[in-house]
Every structure is written in structure tokens, then in C-alpha cells.
């Protein structure tokens, strides 16, 4: 199964890159306590995550219940997230996460265009109890994933998706989910406005 989360890796300048990414989990690698021991990452060539892990084969994978933070990480605008030093590796942990898995690469296949990396968990942080995701959080996640492909998806398709997901926000969102939803809508409007002024191509 693929679990959506946020990855921190170390840039060349020593600062952390924060990026949303799915981790592939084999259920046989989940311990009796529910914690991971291994997982797989598949970053694309050209991404900052690909570069960082090829240069420094370690990082931290986070599970979140903060829909806005996940959206910002996916859309490359999470630079103001609160970080604290990792304990085992040279890197950083997102303070506002539920679980943080410090890892080192155990096996690596850098075949392009997408690497296949097996990560071994070397330290687990249980920052708070996991309460689960509600329908509004899933709505933010779905629109966010779509927004990462805004250059290839028509505005009309986005408007249909927004219309479909909006009731979930109205019925089940708390403050964080509403903030995440508003952030993605503002991100899209900004992209489309720049497209009209010649800053982007738009479908």
C-alpha cells in the first residue's frame, strides 16, 4: 500500500527540503506495535528529493494529521514549517507530525526516470496520538494531488473536482482543513492569474 506523507532531506547548504511523497509499505514489514521497519520511496529524476538522497542517503518520513501542512509540502511552499533536529541522522523532524521515521537507505536502484529506494527505519518518533483522517482532510489531499499537475489539467476539470469535494469541506472540516482547502484554492487562482498574464501556459 502507498501512504501519503512528507519527507525531509538535507540540501547541499545544510537546510532541509520539505516535500510530500508517498511511501510504499509492505504489511510484513510493520512491527507488532504498528511501527514501520522498512518502506520504499520512488523519487523522480530532477527532483530535489532525488538529488538529496543520491548525495546523502538518509532522511525523515512523516505521517501527518495536518492537511494544510501536507498541501503546502506538496506544492513546495512549506519552507516556514517548524523543524527540530533529528536524533540519529543529520536532518530535521517536522514538529507538527504524528509519526516521524528517521531512515537510512538500505538498497538503492537509481535507474531513471524514477529511483527505487528501500529505506530502513533507524529511529521512530511518536509525537502524538493518531486520530485518523476525516472526509475533509481527504478532500484537501485529493485537490492537492491534482494541483501538483495544474500545468496539464484544464481549469474546467478543476472546477468540477472542486464542486464535487466542496460539500465534504462544508460538512466535516475543522479550522485546519478549511485553511488547507483555502490555501489550495488560492494556489490555483494564483496560477491561473499568472497564466492569463503570460506567466504560465494554461489548458
List PLM regions with ranges.
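Basic, polyanion-binding surface patches
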Residues: 1-100, 104-203
Amino acid at each position: 500500500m502507498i501512504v501519503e506523507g512528507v519527507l525531509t532531506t538535507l540540501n547541499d547548504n545544510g537546510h532541509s527540503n520539505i516535500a510530500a511523497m508517498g511511501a510504499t509499505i509492505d504489511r510484513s514489514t510493520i512491527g507488532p506495535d504498528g511501527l514501520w521497519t522498512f518502506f520504499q520511496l520512488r523519487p523522480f529524476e530532477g527532483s530535489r528529493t532525488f538529488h538529496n538522497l543520491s548525495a546523502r542517503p538518509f532522511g525523515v518520513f512523516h505521517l501527518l494529521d495536518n492537511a494544510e501542512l501536507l498541501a503546502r509540502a506538496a506544492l513546495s511552499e512549506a519552507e516556514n514549517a517548524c523543524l527540530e533536529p533529528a536524533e540519529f541522522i543529520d536532518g530535521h523532524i517536522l514538529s507538527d507530525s504524528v509519526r516521524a521515521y528517521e531512515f537510512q537507505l538500505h538498497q538503492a536502484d537509481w535507474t531513471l526516470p524514477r529511483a527505487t529506494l528501500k529505506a530502513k527505519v533507524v529511529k521512530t518518533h511518536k509525537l502524538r496520538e493518531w486520530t485518523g483522517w476525516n472526509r475533509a482532510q481527504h478532500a484537501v489531499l485529493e485537490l492537492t494531488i491534482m494541483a501538483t499537475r495544474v500545468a496539464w489539467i484544464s481549469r474546467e476539470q478543476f472546477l468540477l473536482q472542486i464542486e464535487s469535494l466542496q460539500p465534504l469541506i462544508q460538512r466535516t472540516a475543522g479550522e485546519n482543513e478549511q485553511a488547507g482547502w483555502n490555501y489550495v484554492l488560492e494556489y490555483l487562482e494564483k496560477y491561473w492569474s499568472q497564466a492569463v498574464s503570460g506567466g504560465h501556459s494554461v489548458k
